Amino acid sequence: MVEELPSVFLVGPMGAGKTTIGRLLAKQLGRSFVDSDWYIESQTGADIAWIFAKEGEAGFRERETRAIDELTQQPQIVLATGGGAVMAAENREYLKQRGIVIYLNAPVDVQMARTAKDKSRPLLQQPNPRKILQGLYSARDPLYREVAHIIMPTGHTYPRHMVNQLLQQLNSFCISTSVDSEPEKD
């Protein structure tokens, strides 16, 4: 059943493991992996921090929406989105309608541990990053849940084990949706 999967889109906060899990999942599925932030960087020739500095968050979000639109139309990929991709209503629609969305749900403590020394995250280059992460989590968690077909807690197990769990959930999801979509027989 997993061969019949549409594209798989990973959403969640920064530090949730979207890139790590996405790479491993793509390898297991025999698919291409794309990180939307890397895609934006390759399209613009500039890194995310530079785009934020020159165009502000609004400029970056416009680029992100174009990228999400393009990438969600590619067949059978595994896509890791940026943490704020769900803020735009059109991105949420693209994700929900064009593939299976997995929400990697990482508690703020896990996010802090994974992003503490990362200087490439513009939103955290301010005093009190924990407060910023808590605010982002509170604002975005309902949106991640809105688009998610599958919710997977992160930070409590090894990435390879998580991928195995996701493969089982994806297989179950495919079975349940194919049964639901079959016409009823009289």
From Swiss-Prot:
Co-factor binding details: Binds 1 Mg(2+) ion per subunit.
One GO biological process term: amino acid biosynthetic process
Binding sites annotated in the UniProt record for ATP: G15, A16, G17, K18, T19, T20, R121
Enzyme class (EC, first level): transferase
Catalytic activity as recorded in UniProt: shikimate + ATP = 3-phosphoshikimate + ADP + H(+)
One CC-aspect GO term: cytosol
Binding site for Mg(2+): T19
Taxonomic superkingdom: Bacteria
One Gene Ontology term of the molecular function aspect: magnesium ion binding
Pathway note: Metabolic intermediate biosynthesis; chorismate biosynthesis; chorismate from D-erythrose 4-phosphate and phosphoenolpyruvate: step 5/7
EC number: 2.7.1.71
Cofactor(s) this protein cannot do without: Mg(2+)
Homology family: Belongs to the shikimate kinase family.
Assembly description: Monomer.
Designated name of the protein: Shikimate kinase
